[in-house]
Curated annotation (Swiss-Prot):
Keyword field contains Secreted: yes
Taxonomic path: Eukaryota, Metazoa, Ecdysozoa, Arthropoda, Hexapoda
Natural source organism: Blaberus discoidalis (Tropical cockroach)
Localization of this protein: Secreted
Name the record gives this protein: Hypertrehalosaemic prohormone
GO molecular function: hormone activity
Pfam families: Adipokin_hormo
Cysteines paired by S-S bonds: none
Matching InterPro entries: Adipokinetic_hormone_CS (IPR002047), AKH/RPCH_hormone (IPR010475)
Principal subcellular localization: secreted
Modified residues (Threonine amide): T31
């Protein structure tokens, strides 16, 4: 039994050395950044969205044409 206790203590000590965690949490941090309203300058313009839409349409058309020619 004495040997088992020593082994258990060594295993727990190794686990404690390998593990790190934050113990104290401050309640004064508030809600954090995620709840804030962001006025991001990164907004897609209508022109760029239309360009992407047309690009997807053209690629879909190419796929349909390839399927037509490959089925013949």
């Amino acid at each position: 039994m004495n040997h088992l206790v020593k082994v258990l203590i060594v295993v727990v000590a190794i686990a404690l050395v390998l593990c790190e965690a934050q113990v104290n949490f401050s309640p004064g941090w508030g809600t954090g950044k995620r709840s804030a309203v962001q006025d991001s300058p990164c907004k897609g313009s209508a022109e760029s969205l239309m360009y992407i839409y047309k690009l997807v349409q053209n690629e879909a058309q190419k796929i349909l044409e390839c399927e037509k020619f490959s089925s013949n």
